[in-house]
A protein has these predicted regions:
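Hydrophobic ligand-binding cavity/cleft-lining segments
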Residues: 1-44, 129, 133-135, 149-152
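Short, surface-exposed coil-to-beta transition loops
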Residues: 3-5, 55-59, 80-84, 96
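Generic recognition of short, well-ordered alpha-helical interface segments
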Residues: 29, 57, 122-125
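Short, hydrophobic/aromatic-rich segments at coil-to-beta transitions
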Residues: 39-46, 65-73
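Short acidic, glycine-rich loop/turn motifs
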Residues: 49-53, 75-77
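Non-transmembrane, membrane-adjacent beta-strand/coil modules in membrane-associated proteins
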Residues: 54-55, 70
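Beta-strand/loop substructures that line and gate deep hydrophobic ligand-binding cavities in soluble
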Residues: 64, 72-132, 136, 141-145, ...
Length: 152
């Protein structure tokens, strides 16, 4: 097993980043290769993805949750064995997201999957796409110009 640790700062409060991350069904919008995530019940989700050119499916189960702070889940049927994501306030409008991914690199090699470095790069890319999504979606109000040529 290997642990991949990545982090990113986002220009939204931690509670907004957490609220967006809790929308598992929207993961395909920022997670490379993920095609669909379906809620099975309050804690379990079914995933469909294309990874390393192969279609794959697996289930995850949420194992820990602390509102606006932390979310953890384990996986069955995937080389990603578990994830922990934490949300840390940096200011009233900025936060840091830290993601730990437990990756079975030996299991991946046996199935012709991705290298540890490739998965690490994909995880960083996922965080960067999440940042773009959340910052676009939660833009602070009051800074837009309503009229371009308004006389002062």
């Amino acid at each position: 097993m290997s642990i991949i640790e990545k982090s990113i700062e986002v220009n939204v409060p931690e509670y907004k980043a957490y609220a967006q991350w809790m929308k598992f069904e929207e993961f395909p919008q920022f997670m490379e290769g993920v095609k669909e995530v379906t809620r099975l019940d309050g804690k379990r989700f079914h995933w469909k993805a294309e990874i390393a050119g192969r279609n794959t499916e697996w289930e995850t189960e949420v194992t820990a949750q602390a509102a606006d702070q932390r979310l953890a889940w384990t996986s069955r049927g995937s080389v990603i064995k578990g994830c922990v994501v934490t949300f840390h306030p940096l200011s009233s409008a900025k936060s840091k997201i830290m993601l730990q991914v437990e990756y079975d690199s030996q299991g991946s090699a046996e199935h012709g999957g991705e290298t540890l470095e490739a998965v690490s790069q994909r995880v960083q890319g996922d965080l960067e796409r999440f940042k773009a999504l959340i910052e676009k979606r939660w833009r602070p109000p009051g800074r837009d110009t309503i009229f371009d040529n308004f006389p002062m």
